[in-house]
Every structure is written in C-alpha cells, then in structure tokens.
C-alpha cells in the first residue's frame, strides 16, 4: 500500500480528538502504555506525551508503537529523551504514523527526526506532509536506464563509476575519510549536476553536521539570502539522540527525497552518513524490546530493516534517487553482519583503505577492493574499460611484488617488474587528488577532473610516455598536464639547489 502525501490546513491540531492512554512503565527510551479496551493504536502509530515534569517544565515527547503486548498495553520507543516522564501521565494516540514536511519548504533547512526545524530560522510550511513509513514502488514503476554519474573524482570515475539512480556505499573504518569524501561529492554534484540533495545525518558527530552546514552556506549550496533557492535539505539525528530517533531519521530523509522524485519528478541525491548507525540503533531498540539477538549481537530482523529502507531508494519513471551511503566498518572487518548486509543492496562500493591513508594518499580509495556493476565495456565503452583494467592489473602486480621488495629490495626484480613498480607508484600517487572541501587543511585548491581527462592521464602513464618524470610530480594534482608542469617545477628547484 502506497500512502500519498497529505495536504492539510496549517496549524490544525487533531490530537485532542484521539484515543487517550496512560504510561504504565518506563525503561529508558521504551514506554509501556495502557489504553482502554478496544482503543488500541496500530503498530507504527505516533503517540504523544504532553504534560509537565516535577519542576514544571513543559514535556512533549513523541513515541512510535513497536509492539502490542496484550492486556491492552503497547510498547513504544521514544524519539527524544524521556527525562521527566512519570507513570500515569496521559498519552495521546495520533492515529497515524509519524509525518514530516516535504517539498520545496524543506530546502535550506535542518530538521530532526520528527520533521521539526532545528536551525532557529522560524517555522516551516507544514501544509504538505508525508508519512515516513511507506511501501517501496511497485515493480512496474521502476526504471532501469544505465548511465554513468560523473563525480569529478579520478579514482571513482575510472575504477568504480557510479550509476545514475544507483546505490553507492563508502566503506571504511574510523578516520579514513568517509565524511570528507561525502562532503566533496555533495560539493561537486551541487556544482556540476545542479539537482536537489537530501542529507541524512544518522548517528554521527554533531560537530561534523555543523561543519557541513557552514560549508554549504559558504559554497552557496544553501542560499542564506533566499532560502528557497537552496539545493539541499538536511535531516539530523546525531550520536547524542536516543536510539529511536537514530533508527528513524534515515526514513525521514528518504521520505523528503521520495517527494522530490514522485511529485516534483526530479533527480534527487540522497546522502546517508552513516548507514551503520541505522543498523546500530536498530540493534539497541531490538534489545530494549526484548528480542533475542542474532549473529554478533545484531538484531534478528537486520536484513528486513535494511531491505525496507534500501528498497525505497530507487529510480521510477517519474525521477531517480541516487544514494551515496557512508558505511562504517567495525574494526575494519568487512565480514561483520552490518557492512555485509549493506553490500547486497549496492551498485558500486568505494572501499577506503587505512594503508593508503597512512601513506598520505587522499582520497584513500582502494583501487583493488572498490567495485562497480557499471564497469562493463558495453556501458562505459572499450577505452574506459581497458584503461581501468590495465590500472588494476598494474596495481595488483605491484601488490604481489611488495613482499619481495621488502625482503630483497628493488634491485633483485627483473627489468620488466621494475618498470611495472615505477608505473604503479605513479598511478598510486595520481589516484590522489586535492579536494575543494579540504582546501582549509591542505592549502592547495580543489580540482574537478572530467572523465575524458582522467582516462587520458592514466593512458599516458601506462604507455610509458611519462616514465622519465619523478613520482612525486603525480601526487595531489588534478589532470595529467598539472603533473608534467609540477615535474618541470621540481626539476627547476633541484637545479637551483645544485
């Protein structure tokens, strides 16, 4: 059943007309609520607790029904802190799932899981709202066009190209650059693609959310003078929020993106940082609801929860949602159930490597681990495919030779292998790139490199035309012409020192 967005008059509150219950038990963020016989709320209905605590402070807590316990009781998970709640307090059944504002009114604003603005810029037009729980589009509505989504990041466009309307995962452990890469993608896509983006901050650092907001204002993605001209809506449920909020904030962001796709018929970008926190919050809620844990302590409903979110992120005949999701990998273990379940839904995986980050190569994208279903000659063309395969072969050969080099040194290799190693080291450095969003840290201006320029650069390295250039000339540059110019500068500098 697909529930369409509803339109209602502004400020109409129907809470007073609904069923009333009372709090029977409070266990952290979980509430048990008793209702009169025959007046039980449905699963996923929103319940509202209003009143005052012992100090007289106003309380307004929204919960979501998760279980019907019998004996006219339901168990609900709170979307905000339950401080100050007491047994016996009145609970209102709203009679419907959580609904959030959608449409143009959301652009340039920051929302919480309930769709309430948290940026102190005044109220949002809530005449058009949509429930966060909806079924995925029917099979017949889906669209299956295959086209590449250019990002301007060399390593991504060459080795693991993104699909327009596809799902992309950024995999990496702690501190290897997932959020910076997401911020660069938002920046590049807003400039080159000009579409609408929705950013879902799921259980990540509040500081990063604030940095992102400030950078969006600086780069013009959020237009402070005319908010309606902004290109992005932000939804945040950060690390300090209760698990209920972190579990549902992804659905809030997705609901806003679906409206742009289905009603406005736009191509939308949905960024989720971090999808692992969605699973983690689901695991916390599952334990609070008393379910038996499954593998590695995760919830038994892990695949179902992930599927219900991911199946809604898709392209229909009206428009597309291209989704880029950061995936934290616990202890760098890609076989952990959370990242492993996410892998199954993705069209492209960009794996970030701690080894490359340690070498100072950013973006630290692993050229051998990263994959894409789009890297086929019939989709990207023979030239792109051949270049990508040769880059991977050269990198793979270098990886195989590293043990020999570590023990015996470069001199023990054959002439051919030494040439392969020299080219692989140039390729490794040329896969790095200065980012626009990292200008403040690095001091070097960001670079957007088109796909044709990227392919030309790697072809020149592989052909041997640039064998005479020093490998440091290829580090943190844009296209290949910058590398040759940098090599000339290095030569001039070394001559001056002599």
From Swiss-Prot:
Biological processes annotated in GO: proton motive force-driven mitochondrial ATP synthesis
One Gene Ontology molecular-function label: ATP hydrolysis activity
Residues reported to bind ATP: 172-179
Sections of the chain in a coiled coil: none
Family assignment from sequence similarity: Belongs to the ATPase alpha/beta chains family.
Subunit structure: F-type ATPases have 2 components, CF(1) - the catalytic core - and CF(0) - the membrane proton channel. CF(1) has five subunits: alpha(3), beta(3), gamma(1), delta(1), epsilon(1). CF(0) has four main subunits: a(1), b(1), b'(1) and c(9-12).
Stated name of the protein: ATP synthase subunit beta, chloroplastic
Organism: Cinnamomum camphora
Gene: atpB
